[in-house]
Each structure stands twice: as C-alpha cells, then as structure tokens.
C-alpha cells in the first residue's frame, strides 16, 4: 500500500503534464482553424462583390449595346445624332466590360494570395500534428497495459491526426489547390477553393474534437487518481516526462 501511495503523485503528475501538452497543441490547431475560416469569409465577401460587379457590368454592356444598335439602325436617316448614339452606346458597353474584367482580375489576385496563405497554414498544421503524433505514440506505448478506455481514446486521437496529415499532404499538392484550366479565374474556381478550405477546416476540427475527448478522459483519470488513491493502476515511467517535452 505504501508503494502504491508513493507512485500515485507521480502518475497523476505525468497525466497532468500530458493533458497540459494536449491542451496547448489543441489550442494551436484551433487557431489555424480560425485562420482558415477567416480566409473562407474573405473569399465569400469577394465573391459577393464580384457578383455585384458582374451584374453591373452586364447591365452596362446590355444598355450600351442596345444604344449602339439603335444608333446604327437610325444612321441612314439622322446621320449625326444616330452616330453619336452609337458612340455613346459603344462607350457604355466598353465600360461594362471593363467592370467585369476588373472583377475577374480581382479574383485572380485574391485566389493566388489566399492559396499561398492556406498552404502556409496547412504546413504549420502538419508540423504541429507530427509533434502530437510522436507524443501520442509514446503515450499509447506507455499506457499499453493500463486503462483500456484511455488507451482507446489515445488511439482515436492518433487516427484522427493521421487522417488529417494525409489529407494535408494531398491538400498541399499543387493540383488540389490551383484551379484547373477549365475553371479559370472565375466565380466557379473561387467557390471550389472555398469548398476545399472548408474541407480542410473540418479535417482539423475532427482532430481538435478527438484531442478534447482524450483530454476529458485524462482529467477524469487524474481526479480518480487523486481522490480515490488509485494511482497504482496507472503505469508510470520516468521516460514519460522526458517525452512530453519533445
């Protein structure tokens, strides 16, 4: 009994350290999710402005084309006034086209900028999750013959992280982010990019959810270890503390 009591604080302390590490890394991943959501919001705002600009440009082009057609049709009768109407109509139509072209250029520049930003976020998340995977792998080995429920939570968190890492590797490839030629720099390519960003956010959120579940399991075990004096049921190793600070 004295031996178990001596081991209890060490086991509880190791679990607390590990839980603190998980919460810290979980917070960092959540920050990246927030950054991705902000990128998606910016794309949505630009999409709406672009849609309004395209509608305005189309209206101007239609009005200008109508004026030009009417002016040309009247030119044999009233040469001077009709040609002026045609010139004004063509000018209005050109202005409408300029609005649309400017909107398309904004899509090109914005998409390029946001793609670089998302790739940076994905690379940061990948590094963070690799660190977490190393720690979780050691935790599962350390907990191997201990609490099976806690071990399963650790494995679930590892699986979620593995899936997200694989997704990020695929996500970071050029072909996945860069619009295809068939899409071009259009609202379609922007919508596709936004959908991909949302998919990446969902993948990262699945990781934070698994880490939250493991953290709750750790908290309950720490309380059990402290209040019920059952720290001897948790395997303890001096290597765990060293592994928590990789």
Swiss-Prot record:
Presence of the UniProt keyword Cell membrane in the record: yes
Family statement drawn from the similarity comment of this UniProt entry: Belongs to the apolipoprotein L family.
Keyword vocabulary terms for this entry: Cell junction, Cell membrane, Coiled coil, Cytoplasmic vesicle, Membrane, Transmembrane, Transmembrane helix
Induction: In the brain, by electrical or chemical seizures (at protein level).
Membrane topology category: Multi-pass membrane protein
Any one Gene Ontology cellular component term annotated for this protein: plasma membrane
Localization: Cell membrane; Cell junction; Cytoplasmic vesicle, Secretory vesicle
Keyword DNA damage: no
GO MF term (any one): lipid binding
Gene Ontology terms describing biological process: angiogenesis; autophagosome-dependent secretion; endothelial cell activation; lipid transport; lipoprotein metabolic process; regulation of endothelial cell differentiation; regulation of membrane permeability; response to hypoxia
Annotated gene: Apold1
Main location: membrane
Parts forming coiled coils: 193-220
Species of provenance: Rattus norvegicus (Rat)
Tissue: Present at low levels in brain vascular cells (at protein level).
InterPro entries noted in UniProt: ApoL
Entry superkingdom: Eukaryota
General function of this protein: Is a modulator of endothelial barrier permeability, required for proper organization of endothelial cell-cell junctions and cytoskeleton. It also plays a role in the modulation of secretory autophagy. May affect blood-brain barrier permeability.
Regions crossing the membrane: 50-72, 89-109
Name this polypeptide is given: Apolipoprotein L domain-containing protein 1
